[in-house]
Amino acid sequence: MSEKLRRCRKELTAAIDRAFEGVRHSQECTAQQRLDAPSLTSQPVHRLLCRNPLAACPSAAPYSGASCAPESENPAFGTHHIPVNSKLQQPLYPKRKPLTSKENVLMQSSILARDRQFWRAAGDGEDWRKDSLRKDMERDLKADPNVLLSSSSQEVTKDLLDMIDHTSIRTIEELAGKLEFENELNRVCGHCQDSPFKEEAWALLVDESPQKALDADPGSLKQALDDQNIVETVLDLEEDYNLMTSFKYQIE
C-alpha cells in the first residue's frame, strides 16, 4: 500500500511540474511576441493612414498599382492642403438643453408662462380632494351599467354625494367616520324610541334642557341623565376624531 501511495505521489508531482512548465512557457511566448511586435503608437498618425495593406504582403507587392507616396511628396498631408468640410464641423444632432436646470428656469421663464393656468393654489387642495372623491364614487356607480340600482340605493348615493359637497369631508376615511357616527346616533335614537321616556330623550337630542322634561315626569331623572351621557360621549368621540384627522393632515 505504501508503494502505491509513493508512486501516486511521484506521478502527481510530475504532472504538477509539467503543468507549471506549460504555463511558464506560454507566458514567455506571450512576452516575446509583445516585444517583437512593432509599436503602433510610436508611428505618426499620417503614416498609419497612408499605410498600404498590399505592401505588408510580399507576394502582393508586384500587383500593387502604386506605392504610398512619401510624407513630403503626398499632397494630402501638406499643412496648406488639408480639405475642410463645413458640413462635418456641424454636429449631427442639436445639443439638447436640460429641462429642469436652474439656468433654463431663470433665463427662459417665458416657457413656463403658458403652463400657469394648470397650476393650483394652496387653498384649492380641499376642493380638488372633494372633486376627486366625487368622481371616484360616480365612476364606481358607472362601472357596471347592467346592474339596476334600486330607488333606495340611488337615494343613499345621492345623499352621500350631497354630504361630500356640503361638508368638509376630503377623504374616504372621513366619510366612513361620518357614517359611523350617524349610525351610532341612529342606534341611540332607536333605543330611545323603544323606551318609555321618548320625549325626554328627544329633548336631549335637540339640545333642550332636561330640567323642562323633568318637570313633567320627575321619575325619569335617571334615564334622562343616562341618555344625556350617551349623547355627550358620542359627541366627544366625534370631536376627538375630527381633531385626530386634522392633526394627521397637518403632519402630512
Curated annotation (Swiss-Prot):
Loss of function: phenotype: Male mice are infertile with smaller testis and epididymis, but female mice retain normal fertility. Spermatogenesis in the male mouse is arrested at the spermatocyte stage, and no sperm is found in the epididymis. Germ cells apoptosis is increased without changes to the serum concentration of testosterone, LH, and FSH or synapsis and recombination during meiosis.
Phosphoserine PTM sites in chain numbering: S195, S209
Tissue: Testis-specific. Highly expressed in spermatocytes (at protein level).
GO BP terms: cell differentiation; spermatogenesis
Function: Essential for normal spermatogenesis and male fertility.
Keyword vocabulary terms for this entry: Differentiation, Phosphoprotein, Spermatogenesis
Protein's UniProt keywords contain Transferase: no
Cross-referenced InterPro entries: DUF4712
Protein name: Uncharacterized protein C3orf62 homolog
